[in-house]
Curated annotation (Swiss-Prot):
Coiled coil start-end: none
UniProt lineage: Bacteria, Pseudomonadati, Pseudomonadota, Gammaproteobacteria, Enterobacterales
HAMAP family hit by this protein: DadA (MF_01202)
Function: Oxidative deamination of D-amino acids.
The protein, known as: D-amino acid dehydrogenase
Domain of life according to the entry: Bacteria
Gene responsible for this protein: dadA
Record SUPFAM superfamilies: FAD-linked reductases, C-terminal domain, FAD/NAD(P)-binding domain
Length: 417
């Protein structure tokens, strides 16, 4: 079957790889000259199934109000009063209760765990290299309340069979030695030993090269103008002056998927702006071993080979991609506080990207209201964590194979009535 994939980020390229493995004739289209130049370019680098959780959680509405008056708040909202923003925020608010949180986190962990397994199998099959580490991830708590609140997530982890370790402040240095110097600032941590890290952009480009060798065609530097639809079927993709025709189509354009589909149906995918710093590594002993996640500021600090990636923040500001110096201040503050000697922070590169977020945190993976159009978008802050699993799942669905995990609750049907 001829399949066109819109988007060459980590989700689109992973989907292309798995579809090619099923024998499909795959073409990937993207407006950028190379794969992984937008949201996949500078993310935090963590592959963290156990930390997969929706931003819509009990207490978030009240926290959001408090964060409005804090200098280093992890979430900032700039209302533009557009229907898209207001509708998305209202739907998110409706998911901020304990029942929805438990349901949403459980299915996110299910997909993320599956994705981690798919990545490990891909690594065994291909030997792909992307500065990956299998050292687990560590969530750091600065208050006793954060430490106590971890029991809510631990219950979901236990139900999903995800191994974990709840550590006191004195045990943190046993897994992240450099934290010994700042232990007095922390109350403890939650460690997930099976989580991983790696450079998402490097992975995506390596996988794209392997996909090309497997027969996937990449049409890069092509702007998708619109879908051509007749009845309930997509009949082509208009790119500049070229119409590209296939038997099936996959929408993997992240936050931009919403606008391309709006003429036919709405999907609740909205951009959540994030930031990162990439710092040259100066001292191994003063740097993290893997990934640590500061729960207070929602900032992750990840070790690559000779670089440190510091990523986080969330701004609800539409499609604005300006670099906000205040966000750099927050990222620098967190890394200076925890790893002050890891590298020359003043030499860091500063990046921003738009994560495609759904109100309930779960991506849209599967069929759409158009018969031959499939969705693989809305992964939010977890695109790298969920990419391989989402790609394999979508390839199975499109190929009329039974998915290896429950997938019905991942489709857009939970929103489109």
């Amino acid at each position: 079957m001829r399949v066109v994939i819109l988007g060459s980020g980590v989700v689109g390229v992973s989907t292309a790889w798995y579809l090619a493995q099923e024998g499909h004739d795959v073409t990937v289209i993207d407006r950028q000259p190379e794969p992984a130049l937008e949201t996949s370019a500078g993310n935090a680098g963590q592959i963290s199934p156990g930390y997969a959780a929706p931003w819509a959680a009990p207490g978030i509405p009240l926290k959001a109000i408090k964060w409005m008056f804090q200098r280093h708040a992890p979430l900032a909202i700039r209302p533009d009063f557009t229907a898209a923003q207001l509708c998305w925020m209202w739907q998110m608010l409706l998911n901020c209760d304990a029942r929805h949180y438990k349901t949403n986190k459980a299915r996110m962990v299910r997909l993320a765990e599956y994705s981690r397994d798919c990545l490990q199998q891909l690594r065994r099959d291909t030997g792909i290299q992307y500065e990956g580490r299998q050292g687990g991830t560590l969530q750091l708590f600065r208050t006793e309340q954060q430490y106590d609140n971890a029991t809510r997530d631990i219950a979901v982890l236990e139900e999903a069979g995800v191994p974990y370790q709840l550590l006191t402040r004195h045990e943190l240095a046993s897994v992240e030695p450099a934290l010994a110097n700042v232990a007095e600032k922390l109350t403890g941590g939650l460690r997930l030993p099976h989580d991983e890290t790696g450079d998402c952009q490097l992975f995506t480009r390596q996988l794209a090269a392997m996909a090309a060798d497997a027969g996937v065609t990449f049409k890069l530097g092509r702007h998708v103008r619109q879908l051509r639809v007749e009845g309930q079927n997509v009949t082509g993709v208009q790119c500049d002056d070229e119409m590209i025709v296939a038997d099936a189509y996959v929408m993997a354009c992240g936050s931009y998927s919403t606008g391309l589909l709006r003429q036919w149906f709405d999907i609740p995918v909205y951009p959540l702006k994030g930031y990162s710093l990439t710092i040259p590594l100066a001292d191994d002993a003063s740097a993290p071993v893997s990934t640590v996640l500061d729960e207070t500021y929602k900032v992750a600090i990840t070790r690559f080979d000779r670089r440190i990636r510091v990523g986080g923040m969330a701004e609800v500001v539409g499609f604005n991609t300006d670099l906000n110096p205040k966000r750099r201040e927050t990222l620098e503050m967190v890394v200076r506080d925890l790893y002050p000697h890891c590298g020359p922070i003043e030499q860091a590169t500063f990046w921003t990207g738009l994560r495609p977020m759904t109100p309930d945190g779960t991506p849209l993976v599967g069929r759409s209201p158009l018969k031959n159009l499939y969705l693989n978008t809305g992964h939010g802050t977890l695109g790298w964590t969920m990419a391989c699993g989402s790609g394999k799942l979508l390839a199975d669905i499109l190929s009329d194979k039974s998915p290896e995990i429950e997938a019905n609750d991942l489709s857009v049907e939970r929103y489109v009535r």
